[in-house]
């Protein structure tokens, strides 16, 4: 019977090594590829930093995606550029956006990114700012974000109701300057002789009798109504007397009108001049103009000159 291979697990079931303190500050060193050829420089660097809490990664491997970093693990990220800045341009050229996409999640809140030879220049931190880091005293710091639940209010904000002003209740001794009661009686300001004086009517308020005729009241007792009626009657009689100068009846329209006879002339004395000069009731309206004294006959509604 052939023998079968046997695998033996030699790892201990219980690891009694001291657990790593999570409160210790960890440091990540980022080195350009050229520093690997100088072993003495790496030895000097590890003499400065504690190896138990310090990790070293190459920038070219980090940029190529060959290395993964733990999340929120480092308090300080130091880019090795030599103290004299000999490798500054090389290191900054490798700090691309892909490197920051891996580096930023590995930094703790408030962790800092620094250069070995000094602070970042104004034009050297563009990719760090785009990655979400904030400039602070020549270095870049990861801001400490806080998560909080915010309730969503979709309704309209209710307006605060303004309480009405309390109504003032008038009491004894309450003074209100906005009431309609007069504080001073105007009649008390006049003496007895002032009240007895006749009222002086201004000249501009007096009616102009020459231009405007006064009208009598409906129940006039001063005699103005009788005076106005007498004036109207006199004016009417005068107008009737002027109309009686020439008044033709219906049966007189067929008679001969002779202007040579005394008393047979019109009141306007313009009957012979034409329609433009004749009265409204003139019997010669529509006839042509004729000479004064010319015989005019109106027979069967036809004028014969």
Swiss-Prot record:
Indicate whether Iron appears among the record's keywords: yes
Keywords from the UniProt entry: 2Fe-2S, 4Fe-4S, Cytoplasm, Iron, Iron-sulfur, Metal-binding, Mitochondrion
Q: Where is this motif: Cx2C motif 1?
A: 268-271
Q: Where is the protein situated, by its record's location annotation? A: Cytoplasm; Mitochondrion intermembrane space
The UniProt entry annotates the motif Cx2C motif 2 at: 279-282
Which residue stretches belong to region N-terminal SAM-like domain?
Answer: 21-150
Which residues does the annotated region (Fe-S binding site B) include?
268-282
Instruction: Give all cystine bridges in this chain.
Output: none
What are the required cofactors?
A: [2Fe-2S] cluster; [4Fe-4S] cluster
Q: Which residues bind [4Fe-4S] cluster?
A: 268, 271, 279, 282
Coarse class of the primary localization is: cytoplasm
Q: What do the Gene Ontology cellular component annotations say?
A: mitochondrial intermembrane space
The record's annotation in Pfam families points to: CIAPIN1 (PF05093), DRE2_N (PF16803)
Q: Where is this region: Linker?
A: 151-195
Q: Which InterPro entries match?
A: Anamorsin (IPR007785), CIAPIN1 (IPR046408), Dre2_N (IPR031838)
Q: Name one GO biological process term.
A: iron-sulfur cluster assembly
Q: Where does [2Fe-2S] cluster bind?
A: 205, 217, 220, 222
What GO MF terms are annotated? 2 iron, 2 sulfur cluster binding; 4 iron, 4 sulfur cluster binding; electron transfer activity; metal ion binding
Name the Gene3D superfamilies on file: Fe-S cluster assembly protein Dre2, N-terminal domain (3.40.50.11000)
Q: Which residues form the signal peptide?
A: none
- Assembly and interaction partners: Monomer. Interacts with tah18. Interacts with mia40.
Entry-linked HAMAP family: Anamorsin
Q: Which family does it belong to?
A: Belongs to the anamorsin family.
Q: What does this protein do?
A: Component of the cytosolic iron-sulfur (Fe-S) protein assembly (CIA) machinery required for the maturation of extramitochondrial Fe-S proteins. Part of an electron transfer chain functioning in an early step of cytosolic Fe-S biogenesis, facilitating the de novo assembly of a [4Fe-4S] cluster on the scaffold complex cfd1-nbp35. Electrons are transferred to dre2 from NADPH via the FAD- and FMN-containing protein tah18.
User: What free text does the record give on domains?
Assistant: The C-terminal domain binds 2 Fe-S clusters but is otherwise mostly in an intrinsically disordered conformation. The N-terminal domain has structural similarity with S-adenosyl-L-methionine-dependent methyltransferases, but does not bind S-adenosyl-L-methionine. It is required for correct assembly of the 2 Fe-S clusters.
Q: What is this protein called?
A: Fe-S cluster assembly protein dre2
Q: Which organism is it from?
A: Talaromyces marneffei (strain ATCC 18224 / CBS 334.59 / QM 7333)
Organism ancestry: Eukaryota, Fungi, Dikarya, Ascomycota, Pezizomycotina
